[in-house]
Regions:
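Conserved substrate/cofactor phosphate-moiety recognition/catalytic segment
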Residues: 13-76, 90
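Conserved phosphate-donor/acceptor-positioning beta-strand/loop module used by diverse small-molecule
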Residues: 100-122
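Short, hinge-like loop/turn segments at secondary-structure boundaries
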Residues: 44-47, 99, 125-128
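The conserved Walker
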Residues: 7-8
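Acidic, metal-coordinating catalytic cores used for nucleic-acid/nucleotide bond scission
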Residues: 82-92, 115
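Short hydrophobic/aromatic beta-strand immediately N-terminal to the Walker A/P-loop
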Residues: 2-3
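Loop/turn-to-beta-strand initiation segments
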Residues: 76-81, 105
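Conserved GTP-binding G-domain of TRAFAC-class P-loop NTPases and closely related GTPase folds
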Residues: 117-203
Length: 203
């Protein structure tokens, strides 16, 4: 099982291609169901547009369906690629431990981009491709929570110390957002972000 951690608009889809996983890996991602189901019910993929209550309830059902789908494939010992923003870190830790316990090898990959980059990517994804738009407020909330979990509390590195877990990116790459000030660090080299994608260079 491979987990890819990253906030909305961080480039997780791009990283999936970079990792070059075999085609038999099954992607577990609620947002893919959202993009398939919402239009069937006449619901906009722009999460800022109403009806909010209907969208929230439908998304909860899709999250449950995704969890059930994952259980089904785990029972069949299928290889999985789990795409997650990583904000519910305790739940992720429980899932990782459960997978290792039943015999899975687990690998983790984390992406760290500044919240402003996440917001920009989310906006461009909607404007250029018509794909889902989370919106700047929620995107920033998710990005800030991700920074707290992954960067400040070093949960990603802690997970890497668990039995049966391998880190595919073994450094916090790079710590470009200062969670204390809410600003991009002055020493951040913006050249690591090119062509609206995250280029994985050595810090």
């Amino acid at each position: 099982v491979v987990f890819i951690f990253g906030p909305a608009g961080a480039g997780k889809t791009y990283i999936k291609d970079v990792l070059g996983l075999p085609n038999n890996f099954i992607v577990i991602n609620t947002d893919e169901l959202v993009e398939d189901v919402f239009p069937r019910y006449g619901l906009s993929l722009n999460f800022e547009e109403g009806p909010q209550v209907v969208k929230q309830e439908l998304r909860k059902l899709l999250q449950q369906a995704t969890a059930e789908r994952m259980r089904k494939y785990v029972n069949k010992c299928m290889p999985l690629l789990i795409d997650t923003p990583g904000e519910k870190i305790n739940k992720i830790r429980d899932i990782v431990r459960a997978l290792v316990e039943i015999g899975y090898d687990v690998a983790l990959f984390q992406i760290n981009v500044p919240p402003d980059y996440s917001v920009q990517s989310d906006e461009e994804r909607w404007a250029k491709k018509g794909e889902r738009k989370v919106g700047p407020k929620l995107t920033r909330q998710i990005a800030n929570q991700y920074q707290k979990n992954v960067v400040r509390d070093a949960v990603y590195l802690q997970l890497g110390e668990e039995r049966g877990v391998t880190l595919l990116s073994d450094k916090i790459y790079p710590n470009i957002f200062d969670i204390n000030t809410g600003e991009i660090r002055e020493d951040f080299d913006e050249s690591v972000l090119q062509d609206d994608k995250l280029e994985l260079k050595d810090p």
